[in-house]
Swiss-Prot record:
Glycosylated sites: 139, 222
Subcellular location: Membrane
Function recorded in the entry: Cytochrome P450 monooxygenase; part of the gene cluster that mediates the biosynthesis of the mycotoxin pyrichalasin H, a tyrosine-derived cytochalasan that inhibits the growth of rice seedlings, but also inhibits lymphocyte capping and actin polymerization and alters cell morphology. Pyrichalasin H is indicated as the responsible agent for the genus-specific pathogenicity of M.grisea toward crabgrass. The first step in the pathway is catalyzed by the O-methyltransferase pyiA which methylates free tyrosine to generate the precursor O-methyltyrosine.
GO CC, one annotated term: membrane
UniProt pathway: Mycotoxin biosynthesis
Entries under Pfam families matching the protein: p450
Official protein name in the record: Pyrichalasin C-18 hydroxylase
Lineage: Eukaryota, Fungi, Dikarya, Ascomycota, Pezizomycotina
GO terms (BP aspect): secondary metabolic process
Essential cofactor(s): heme
Similarity comment: Belongs to the cytochrome P450 family.
Membrane topology designation: Single-pass membrane protein
Statement: the UniProt record of this protein carries the keyword Kinase: no
């Protein structure tokens, strides 16, 4: 065989190479001549056949990869609950009734994942990220190669959970002033009732309040910036929905088209962020005392670029990486916080007794209109109110969403192979009559009263992660920004309660939350609120 290869391939190649040596051709030029000679000698139609076979192979590979990214394979020994629905709501209810205390495979029209009962909460939360990853779950279900969801760097997460959280008490009064300015711009100070589309109004308020801390007030009030941040999750959601609706075989070819608005939006955010971050880089490198530069400060914006640079190695801290981190920061901190505030304002409108209780607490805690420069644990009733809103209106059906990276065997169910998507039934926790008396009822004092009991002083906080508080996740992969989100919500709600009244138009009630294919809930975007200034 070797002699045949030598005679038919190697020797002709050497002859041609020696013949062309005087021309001093490069290897690339010589390769092109050889390839052209080979293809010219092929029978007519061979190229078409080869191209068709190559295309078929490419499509087959892409189809397999696409299917692996959107669905978990059926697992022997695991029951399957399948419906041709666009959401998981009824599927999970059925599985909960058919297989109590057992895992099952939930399959809807777009996705599939293994749903575990609440009894497995602690087992799953203890799994390390290299075994079962939350980021990989969201990256997979949101086509992360295009949306960039789930690509947060470890340095970004460290900066949020440690440095940003530590800076919050010093910034309470500054954030109050920023909050006041945002409400004045978005809502105004009119004594007459005025109608607002509540979801987008809260979205805009949270976008601007958060941006004041991260990118400074100038960019935070720039309409192009505000619009781009608000549209970032919208464009990603639309791209995911459109690509989910495409047949598996064409998804790889449609991805660029469906995510084109999202890609354009990231370009816009990059263009606006670049000059701000270049200035941050200069200030950080010019600072002689880096510890003093990173010290929590009351004025100006949070030195978040400095936080990031203190965690990155110098070679990693490029402008491109910082821009990516800031886009992730804006995406992760805005829509979920806005959704909680939306539901909190709705509950204020529906439950006027809660309004009076919360205003009374604010009068007791605030001094000259200022909140204490702490993590705001003093607002116990506010904390209970927000957690009750979160319990009744969670982000979605599931908690502890994970993508299995290494084989996993829990106390119940079969061995889960790598690539499996799994989650815990969080809705069963929030609606459990064993945990919460009258779970369908809104009770502003539910968690306030629980904390009054001896030994519960440090439990049942809004930001608590535990098996009875599924909203933030738990363990080492819990939401790193939950303390910042709670701080934002308490400051915003305190300002609203002291300065505004709210009603929901009767024709918008009851509010209708829409389940999405991924298992998350979409707040009612039809809700119209009537708001007026109190003074």
């Amino acid at each position: 065989m070797f002699l045949s290869i030598k005679r038919k391939i190697i020797e002709p190649y050497l002859v041609i190479r020696q013949s062309l040596a005087p021309l001093k051709l490069s290897r690339w030029q010589l390769t092109k001549i050889m390839a052209r000679t080979a293809f010219d000698g092929l029978p007519s139609g061979t190229l078409i056949v080869l191209a068709a076979l190559s295309l078929a192979l490419l499509v087959a590979v892409l189809r397999i990869k696409s299917q692996e990214r959107t669905r978990s394979k059926e697992i022997p020994g695991l029951p399957v609950v399948k419906r041709n629905h666009l959401h998981y709501l009824d599927i999970v209810r059925e599985g909960r009734e058919l297989y109590p205390g057992q895992p099952f495979m939930a399959v809807n029209k777009r996705h599939s994942l293994v749903v575990f009962p609440p009894s497995c909460f602690n087992e799953i939360k203890r799994l390390p990220a290299h075994t079962a990853s939350a980021k990989k779950f969201f990256n997979t279900t949101n086509y992360g190669d295009w949306s960039h969801v789930g690509e947060e760097s470890p340095e970004l997460i460290k900066s949020v959970i440690a440095d940003l959280t530590r800076s919050l008490p010093a910034r309470v009064h500054t954030r109050q002033d920023e909050c006041r300015d945002v409400f004045d711009e978005v809502v105004g100070r009119r004594r007459e009732w005025k109608e607002f589309p509540l979801l987008m109004t809260t979205f805009e308020i949270i976008t601007q309040i958060n941006a004041c801390s991260f990118v400074g007030k100038t960019l935070a009030t720039n309409r192009s910036w505000v619009r781009s941040v608000m549209m970032l999750p919208v464009f990603i959601h639309v791209g995911v929905m459109l690509l989910d609706a495409c047949p598996l075989i064409v998804r790889p070819f449609m991805a660029y088209l469906t995510f084109l608005p999202s890609i354009k939006n990231r370009w816009d955010l990059t263009r606006m962020l670049a000059p701000v971050l270049k200035k941050d880089l200069e200030e950080y490198h010019e600072a002689k005392d880096k510890k003093e530069f990173l010290r929590p400060r009351a004025e100006g914006k949070v030195p978040f670029t400095g936080f990031l640079l203190s965690h990155y190695k110098s070679a990693q801290a490029s402008l491109k990486q910082l821009i990516s981190d800031y886009i992730h920061l804006s995406f992760d901190s805005t829509p979920n916080t806005a959704a909680v505030m939306f539901h909190a304002l709705c509950e204020l409108a529906i439950h006027p007794e809660a309004v009076e209780a919360l205003r009374q607490e604010l009068d007791e805690v605030m001094v000259d209109g200022k909140l204490p420069p702490t993590h705001l644990q003093e607002l116990r009733k506010m904390d209970s109110f927000l957690r009750e809103c979160f319990r009744l209106h969670p982000f979605g059906i599931f908690t502890l969403q994970r993508r299995v990276e290494q084989p996993v065997q829990l106390s119940v169910g079969p061995l889960l192979p790598p690539g499996t998507l799994m989650a815990v039934d969080g809705q069963a926790i929030d609606g459990s009559s064993e945990l919460w008396p009258n779970p369908e009822k809104f009770d502003v004092y539910r968690f306030y009263n629980l904390r009054q009991k001896l030994g519960n002083e440090n439990q049942y906080h809004f930001a608590t992660t535990s098996p009875d508080s599924p909203g933030w996740g738990d363990g080492t992969q819990a939401c790193p920004g939950r303390f910042f989100a709670v701080n934002t919500l308490k400051i915003a709600m305190a300002h609203f309660l002291r300065n505004y009244d709210i009603e929901i138009k009767p024709e918008c009630l009851p509010l209708k939350t829409k389940p999405m294919p991924s298992g998350f809930f979409s707040p009612d975007d039809r809700a119209i609120a009537r708001i007026r200034a109190r003074t």
